[in-house]
Amino acid sequence: MKKIFTLITAVAMGVAALSSCCNKQEESKAKYIFLFIGDGMGASHIAVTESYLSAKAGKIGGEQLTMTQFPIYGTSTTHCENKTITCSAASGTAIASGHKTYYSRLGCDKDFNPLKSMAFPLKEEGYKIGIMSSVPITHATPAAFYASTPDRGDGYGIMMQIPDSGFD
């Protein structure tokens, strides 16, 4: 993955920040938290899709994807700790844990120390954790939320960490 498009992450954080500063009359715990990752998706993918939708509707521009209409919208590109171009393992780790790592490392830092993803403290707070993916759950991006290994290619080792996560 050359670029990470973390639109929904930014939107979720923005909405959380916005809702926390407005109307503090009644605070309640979020019932659901969703994180959507367009793995490998960039701004050009969105622009082409919106252009296609406009052409399909017989318009010159104007059609927007729902995600580009959110009140808070953000994008980012990333690089890993040791390369300009990142991979799904390193970028997934950065998204999941907030820490950059080396290329091909999954859920561990540059010194091979395990990094815990944001999903673990949420699980401890009582949230149910589900990881859904259009690729096998042992692939780097979804695995970054439950596994730790210096080699993203260690599918068996990654798979063996699923039960230990305690996720639902």
Predicted segments, located by residue:
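Short helix-onset patch at the extreme N-terminus, typifying the N->h transition
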Residues: 6-9, 69
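C-terminal motif of bacterial Sec signal peptides marking the signal peptidase cleavage site
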Residues: 18-20
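N-terminal catalytic scaffold of extracellular/periplasmic and nuclease hydrolases
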Residues: 23-168
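Bacterial N-terminal signal peptides
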Residues: 8-16
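Positively charged n-region of N-terminal signal peptides that target proteins for export
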Residues: 1-4
